[in-house]
A protein has these predicted regions:
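Multi-pass alpha-helical transporter architecture, strongest
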Residues: 153-176
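Helix-loop junctions at membrane interfaces in 12-TM secondary transporters
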Residues: 69-83, 92
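Intracellular juxtamembrane helix-capping segments at the cytosolic ends
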Residues: 91-105
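Structural signature of the two symmetry-related core transmembrane helices
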Residues: 54-69
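Loop-to-transmembrane helix entry/capping segments in MFS-fold secondary transporters
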Residues: 21-22, 104-118, 145-148
Length: 176
């Protein structure tokens, strides 16, 4: 789902809000700053406080909310505001890795980390062209209707499905 942002941010903001390269660069800088704060500061504080499982649920929901907010933003200032829940969703990834590691024998850690890396690689191969095509489909001249936020709706939907799957799996299988 996050590939909706990674592969379409520049196209979306230029198309929807008529941003220029400087504005796109500023927004990407802010994303980098927010991600750095979440990854470098917030995770160390919040994940131990609420636990990894809740961090997964909350993080995935925040990603979902951020995606849907991006999709339906009507003003540039909204995009900057909506970066907050989206970037806060970054608490989910490290928590998910921690939960997976906690539930695997030490002798299987390398294998499970390899599986996780492979899944991330597969999504990095499939996600960008898929999301770019969705953007194209809803913005080209003969589109059935114009909706540049479509990749974010798809990304948000995928994040929501991930949240439900995580909840069902962790509720049934998590030992801690």
């Amino acid at each position: 789902g996050s590939h909706a942002v990674q592969s379409n941010w520049s196209f979306y903001t230029m198309y929807r809000f008529n941003w220029d390269e400087q504005m796109v660069g500023i927004s990407l800088g802010i994303i980098g700053l927010l991600v750095g704060l979440v990854q470098g500061v917030l995770i160390r504080w919040i994940n131990p406080k609420i636990g990894n499982v809740k961090s997964i649920y909350i993080g995935l929901l925040l990603y979902t909310i951020g995606m849907f907010l991006f999709a339906f933003a009507t003003e540039s200032w909204m995009i900057f505001l909506f970066l907050i829940p989206y970037c806060l969703g970054g608490i989910a990834g490290p928590a998910l890795q921690a939960v997976v590691s906690e539930n695997v024998k030490p002798s299987e850690q390398g294998e499970i980390q390899g599986v996780l890396a492979s899944l991330m690689s597969a999504s990095a191969i499939i996600g960008p062209p898929m999301m770019a095509y969705v953007f194209y489909f809803f913005t080209h001249e003969d589109a059935p209707f114009k909706f540049p936020g479509a990749p974010f709706v798809l990304g948000g939907t995928l994040m929501l499905v991930s949240t439900v799957l995580a909840y069902r799996t962790l509720r049934k299988n998590h030992r801690k």
